[in-house]
Amino acid sequence: MTPEVVIYTDGACSGNPGPGGWGAILIHGEREKELCGGEAATTNNRMELMAAIQALEALKRPCRVELHTDSQYVQKGIHEWIHGWKKRGWLTADKKPVKNDDLWKRLDAARLRHHVDWRWVKGHAGHELNERADALARKGLSEAAAARAAGGA
């Protein structure tokens, strides 16, 4: 099945926790859309999740999606862990609350609107679209860090 939309996502954080950013590139035919944002106090994993969430939520109608991430956390979470978490009421196998469950729940809802083929791509390995997503995440991080330094949230 050929995807209607191809997405590349990335997250970045300066300090973990610290200011962070996320970036996404959405490709539909010949059209591209770039998204980025950031938070003054966050973690790298939260930014990786937010990149995928924002990209999927930006789609106006249900689509066939090929989503590329360099995050093992997102990849393993969506393929291996989420099913057990949901069965256990968002608890880990050790009966502890799932970290970032607010974002995992949001990602779960966003992905269920679409047919998503999740693809892992090696980060910082010269893949053009992954590098562009990384640059967008760093832009979001810079903007969040500047807002934090200026006293904003």
Swiss-Prot record:
The keyword Cytoplasm applies. The keyword Magnesium applies. Keywords: Cytoplasm, Endonuclease, Hydrolase, Magnesium, Metal-binding, Nuclease. NCBIfam families: PRK00203.1 (NF001236). This is Ribonuclease H. Binds 1 Mg(2+) ion per subunit. May bind a second metal ion at a regulatory site, or after substrate binding. Its cofactor is Mg(2+). InterPro entries: RNase_H (IPR050092), RNaseH-like_sf (IPR012337), RNaseH_domain (IPR002156), RNaseH_sf (IPR036397), RNaseHI (IPR022892). The gene is rnhA. Belongs to the RNase H family. Monomer. Residues 1-142 form the RNase H type-1 domain.
